[in-house]
Curated annotation (Swiss-Prot):
GO BP term, example: killing of cells of another organism
Disulphide bridges, residue numbers: none
Keyword rRNA processing: no
MF term (GO), any: toxin activity
Family, per entry: Belongs to the ponericin-G family.
Keyword Secreted applies: yes
GO CC term, one of those recorded: extracellular region
Annotated protein name in UniProt: M-poneritoxin-Ng3a
Amino acid sequence: GWKDWAKKAGGWLKKKGPGMAKAALKAAMQ
């Protein structure tokens, strides 16, 4: 489910940093 995806994304974003988070959010919004 989306909650599992959110957990994975959260851990990944902590490693990758805020710049990647912003890019991912932009991609998700489209």
